[in-house]
Amino acid sequence: MAKRSRGPGRRCLLALVLFCAWGTLAVVAQKPGAGCPSRCLCFRTTVRCMHLLLEAVPAVAPQTSILDLRFNRIREIQPGAFRRLRNLNTLLLNNNQIKRIPSGAFEDLENLKYLYLYKNEIQSIDRQAFKGLASLEQLYLHFNQIETLDPDSFQHLPKLERLFLHNNRITHLVPGTFNHLESMKRLRLDSNTLHCDCEILWLADLLKTYAESGNAQAAAICEYPRRIQGRSVATITPEELNCERPRITSEPQDADVTSGNTVYFTCRAEGNPKPEIIWLRNNNELSMKTDSRLNLLDDGTLMIQNTQETDQGIYQCMAKNVAGEVKTQEVTLRYFGSPARPTFVIQPQNTEVLVGESVTLECSATGHPPPRISWTRGDRTPLPVDPRVNITPSGGLYIQNVVQGDSGEYACSATNNIDSVHATAFIIVQALPQFTVTPQDRVVIEGQTVDFQCEAKGNPPPVIAWTKGGSQLSVDRRHLVLSSGTLRISGVALHDQGQYECQAVNIIGSQKVVAHLTVQPRVTPVFASIPSDTTVEVGANVQLPCSSQGEPEPAITWNKDGVQVTESGKFHISPEGFLTINDVGPADAGRYECVARNTIGSASVSMVLSVNVPDVSRNGDPFVATSIVEAIATVDRAINSTRTHLFDSRPRSPNDLLALFRYPRDPYTVEQARAGEIFERTLQLIQEHVQHGLMVDLNGTSYHYNDLVSPQYLNLIANLSGCTAHRRVNNCSDMCFHQKYRTHDGTCNNLQHPMWGASLTAFERLLKSVYENGFNTPRGINPHRLYNGHALPMPRLVSTTLIGTETVTPDEQFTHMLMQWGQFLDHDLDSTVVALSQARFSDGQHCSNVCSNDPPCFSVMIPPNDSRARSGARCMFFVRSSPVCGSGMTSLLMNSVYPREQINQLTSYIDASNVYGSTEHEARSIRDLASHRGLLRQGIVQRSGKPLLPFATGPPTECMRDENESPIPCFLAGDHRANEQLGLTSMHTLWFREHNRIATELLKLNPHWDGDTIYYETRKIVGAEIQHITYQHWLPKILGEVGMRTLGEYHGYDPGINAGIFNAFATAAFRFGHTLVNPLLYRLDENFQPIAQDHLPLHKAFFSPFRIVNEGGIDPLLRGLFGVAGKMRVPSQLLNTELTERLFSMAHTVALDLAAINIQRGRDHGIPPYHDYRVYCNLSAAHTFEDLKNEIKNPEIREKLKRLYGSTLNIDLFPALVVEDLVPGSRLGPTLMCLLSTQFKRLRDGDRLWYENPGVFSPAQLTQIKQTSLARILCDNADNITRVQSDVFRVAEFPHGYGSCDEIPRVDLRVWQDCCEDCRTRGQFNAFSYHFRGRRSLEFSYQEDKPTKKTRPRKIPSVGRQGEHLSNSTSAFSTRSDASGTNDFREFVLEMQKTITDLRTQIKKLESRLSTTECVDAGGESHANNTKWKKDACTICECKDGQVTCFVEACPPATCAVPVNIPGACCPVCLQKRAEEKP
């Protein structure tokens, strides 16, 4: 009983729980703006309204995805009942009382997939009932009362997979009812009363198709006739239903009519079921409903009443039933009236046809007289005489056995004596895919990238699809199908091994081809043979064995003392890795390292090579004395001849212009270059004497230079040539100076290696040099010599074939300032000293006249088919760079011949040497030493109140090449190339003004500082600004994100890093900037519109400082740099023709070619080929030109390289670097990015005085330095630039992208204020605080410059005298360390009293000097205060308070074609006009 009593209680409790749950669920669904229908169950996006006796569809929330309305009393669905329910996925309407489905019943249900309508009372379905259900997959209509279906009922359901129509009352189905259901998988028509007669045969064919494909299941059972009741519709045949195809019993005949008559075309047919008669005119079905003149009689006859001209044409009768169709012969209705021009009755239509089939293009026309039909190709060319091509009697074009060549346009012409008309159509020949490139079996190493090439043709063009083992490829980033059809698998893994299938698919069919991939595991390199320590005699050849094994096959490289060895006349590396050294000399002694490297890892082994130099005489020893005398004489004669030619007249050709531009101005540089030339010329003369005496040819690469002369004679040659006399001995003892400031020549930056990065030292090498003879002969100097089976191409041919372009693509991101900063920076880093002579040493003839390769000439030959050759030019002027004495030897004895090295005239550091010079001599020439304010010299003052650079003095310069343009000389700056082009000159003007601006501010903040202190502090700030702009603003745009990651963050100074510029950087890599140069220098006014003088072609901007003076100053040029897009480097658009065809051009002369010069300079410097740098940068070795496709994707460029060089091992470095595809986000290719990131990392990390190195600047000062931007420099130092973009390297739209200069952050120089209690001696280079540290190394970095040492300290020199400096008193004290402290102090006091007396004397002298207001001009002549004098015809100078200010007259544009200079007059005049003005 107890158990029984608990039952009802439990049931009540359960009901209560369910009730609560129902309420809770209903509440859950009631979100703001989306109420749940009354009594419905709502949970999230599901709404269930079952068993609620609903008679209409309730309103539900738009986010509803499942709507359940089963078991209600809904009788009809109103159009729009489900509007806005775009998220609905499932709709359940079964078990209701719906009788019909109207049009638009399910509007807006575009995402509905499942629709349940079974067990209703549906009798009819509108043909548009299911329109809009594009996503519907399942439709359930079974157990209804449907009797008929419109054939278009299901045409709007492309994704329908399941359709249930069983248990309805369907008796007949119209053909085509299920035609559009391409995705059908299951169709049920069973349990209907299907009448299986001839009209249902279409359904039988459909069901058979389903069964054969296996993609769909279908059920349909015959109910009638009784004899086949219960049979599947799919099994019935036309024969058992007695169905007969139509057959024609009476055919129509041709007819001729006139206007307004009636014509009859007879057509009778029989068949079962009775066929339907359809009439066609010109292959188009006639509609009896649209034209009342047309009538179809009961027997099938066509009657046309009131005939018109438009009725003429080709008629045909078609009889059709479910068993088939048949057509009568074509008949013609001809219409006759008055003479009429031809009109087409049938125009040809575009027709698709398969290869091998036949095709007919119908064409007929009427007219009076009847027109003649003819056919041609679409371009009016006649049809080919081919038995396959015929014209039918009715005028159609018939082609049988169609081939692919028949594809194209055809024209039908109808002609009578009134007119002719034409109509065209295309025959589109469709063909199965055919493979043109098939994939090959590949064997690769794990981790590599493999390409399976697969290409096919066909019509339509096929699509390439790849599978592996019949299955789809893995969906990951490693598998990529390129647009060409190639399958690329990156980072191949072992499980990628297997069979791959390439399928070419089009609408006609598909073809398949297979390839197999075999993956081998990776193996770290293991040495098979290793070298051992070896001793050889000088002059011998030695082979060092080294080979290794591994997977992938390791690449063998050799290093000597940290520099990679490359293939040359000196070194040869065999395929297995053995290193052969030819003509071993003492310079070859050292440690050699063999490195085996693959993608898995690397292994290395080293050995020591010792060279034994026997004390025996050599063949060249007897000729040393005569050769050195002859060498000195011939070199000096050639140099003097060149000097006379260049400096005693104006430049007459681009050759003169280039030579004058590159000629070193510093006397020390000239002497050092001269010594190197004499040293090398002596060896060449000795070689010639030995060769003549032995009567053998020693000019090949097999000649042993170390057998030429004995070591003691080699040292004698070095002494007599002047090499040892100009060997610098640096002095870095003045640590008070060197810890704070840079020397001008870059010495003592690295205190462990003081010459690292110094000016006038040899370029560094990443790879060993490559010379034909291993010593000094460039590659390609012998045009008949083969390299890897091919001759090297002429540099000019490479330029015209590969590099030069007239097309320029603007850079969408960066301005032309990106290029200009790169050039300005380059002139801070490197400048090669070229030969001092333009004439060959052997006979003194000019290099451009003889076109030979005799030293120092190395002419750029012009190919026979070149445009310049047609004008008679044989070569372009080129002389070799001057060699370093002994080629980089640093010991006191030169006992071996070293490969030729070149001189970097500048300091390697980013230290603003382009502003201040790279030697003490250069620095003093541009300083304003008279004012004692630490300023740089300034030139004429413009209307803006800001000065230009001072003019250079001396003989005629490159800027005065055309006396008809202007007599204005070159500007003087820290780098002698400042006048090369006007954009560069503008940058030099900016930074010279920036120095003077900062120096003026520092003097205001620290009036107690002397001129030297202000100068060096300002120079330090300016150098830091250039460093910051370069690394923070410019380099990220050049290197991109990838390159900046390679460069890495700054972690402090590393004294073990040599910051020197490596030769390949200066000669090839950093010359990539030439590809960024625009052919125009834009000049814009303050509204960023062209100035009156317009933009300037680049060839008119070379050496033209007069344009800055006379044509608006520097502002228009600067706006043209930051206001105009730069040139984008496109692999097919490299150097514009202003640089390759008009470089330094002058009237009636052959201009130079910068691209050809770059290539020739690389060979001159022994730069290894591109392939060696690929290996250095860890790129794959390129044995074929196809191996370059990852870095040079353009096949046309690879083909050009192949035609030019023949072998990848021959490609010069510069052209290869500039044709590499850009790494995304950068302006460099991968090899170029490697080289630049390597160099800039060394420049930063190997610079002890780098601005970010702790202690160089105080934290507060460093914070201010980091406010620097080039935009701020422009605002502060341009003439009147007031609006710029914040980043002048990025393209901005004017005016919206430009802001006021007031918004650009500036450097606050107040943090440089020297806060001191007694400032009388602070900041004085000659003050007491500096006395004890001495200034010996400041002025005398080299031992030979130091005056003779005296036993007593010298007197403090006069401020005005040069060449005298304080002695280092600390060294004097150290020699008396054993004296007592009392004596030391007494001597100290006596010395201090003497120092004070000397200082007073100097102050009196200085006051006396400053009290005079006379001026001394550049010629040493004195002028009284407030006097004026003419310096030349155009320049008037004035003496004002001891300062000389000169003004240059600006000449107006000449009004005649040929103005003439008159002696004593500044501006050219027009003589003709003067003559006219005379009475």
Curated annotation (Swiss-Prot):
Residues 1315-1411 are annotated as: Required in homotrimerization. It is found in: Secreted, Extracellular space, Extracellular matrix; Endoplasmic reticulum; Cell surface; Secreted, Extracellular space, Extracellular matrix, Basement membrane. Disulfide bonds join 36-42, 40-49, 196-243, 198-222, 267-317, 363-412, 454-502, 546-594, 723-885, 732-748, 847-857, 851-875, 959-970, 1177-1234, 1275-1301. One of its GO terms (molecular function) is extracellular matrix structural constituent. Residues 246-332, 342-428, 433-520, 521-610 form the Ig-like C2-type domain. It is linked to Anterior segment dysgenesis 7: A form of anterior segment dysgenesis, a group of defects affecting anterior structures of the eye including cornea, iris, lens, trabecular meshwork, and Schlemm canal. Anterior segment dysgeneses result from abnormal migration or differentiation of the neural crest derived mesenchymal cells that give rise to components of the anterior chamber during eye development. Belongs to the peroxidase family. XPO subfamily. This is Peroxidasin homolog. It comes from Homo sapiens. The lineage of its organism: Eukaryota, Metazoa, Chordata, Craniata, Vertebrata.
